[in-house]
Amino acid sequence: MPAMRLTPSNCQLLGEGLDHPESVCLGPDGTVYAGGEAGQVYRLDTTGGQHLVGTTGGFLLGLTLDGAGAIHACDVGNKALVRMSPEGKVTHRATGIAGRPFVNPNHILFDPQGTLYLTDSGDYWQQETGTGYVATVDAQDNAKIFHAGPFMFANGIALHPSGEWLYIAQSTAANIVRIPLARPNGPMEVTHTLPTGTVPDGIAFAADSRLVIGCYKPDAILVGHPDGTVETLFEDPTGELLNRPTNIAIGEGKLYIANLGGWHLTVVEADFQPAPIHRPRLMQAAP
């Protein structure tokens, strides 16, 4: 199927003056959250209102929402995993593992038990072997290595709908790999090989196990099928509507796309339903 070229008539630009949003996530009521390059968390409600929840003073990459309405985010500026309450209060949950500071904390998600998985991308320029890894952080803010990798700039992560696998985008390898959740440091398997020159960033699973892939380069959204094939879903050769797209959130029949190079989110109607998103209530982490 040929890729759809985005135009102003087939997509919506959401948000005004967002500060180069790298990540986006959805609340259970459809509220949209996005991060900014000065540590901002924006809330965009279903009626079109836009509100600045708070700032961390850093640079926010991946973010996700818990069951109490708090945002958890990778703050690469402060090299920390942070939590922002619905009122905007910021606390640092972790800054590294056993004396090993984070280098590039990049993306996060919760599993059904409330454990948070985090990619530390490592050194972008160490492209022969990579230095990235995957960590876990429990509800008491204890961080440890889950998979030592090394990953080649471990970026976006997504939990397979079966709950058995964690998928990771390797930006400098132009591929997607998976690791078993039941086996720390378990075998790493390439599931999707992307076209040469592609820089995958964020990934998100649909309920039918299709994997939506945001590409920092080119300005395109890909879909990875369960059989390992990959096709381009949307593209924007102008770089105006999609501008360095990074992370993606799947809504009911819509994709919400963060544009690190721009000032808005892009919303496109598409034949996708979201895989389960886990938003645990972390009472121990309450401010």
Residue locations for each model-derived region?
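Loop/turn-rich, solvent-exposed surfaces of beta-rich toroidal or solenoidal domains
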Residues: 175, 192-229
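A short beta-strand motif characteristic of beta-propeller blades
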Residues: 9-15, 48-54, 90-98, 142-148, ...
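Blade/loop signatures of beta-propeller domains
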Residues: 1-9, 37-38, 127-129
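Short, solvent-exposed loop/turn segments at conserved positions within beta-propeller repeat blades
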Residues: 37, 76-77, 125-132, 171-173, ...
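Beta-propeller domains
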Residues: 33-52
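Beta-rich, blade/repeat-based domains predominating
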Residues: 16-29, 38, 56-75, 98-119, ...
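Short loop/turn segments that connect beta-strands within beta-propeller blades
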Residues: 44-49, 85-89, 137-141, 180-184, ...
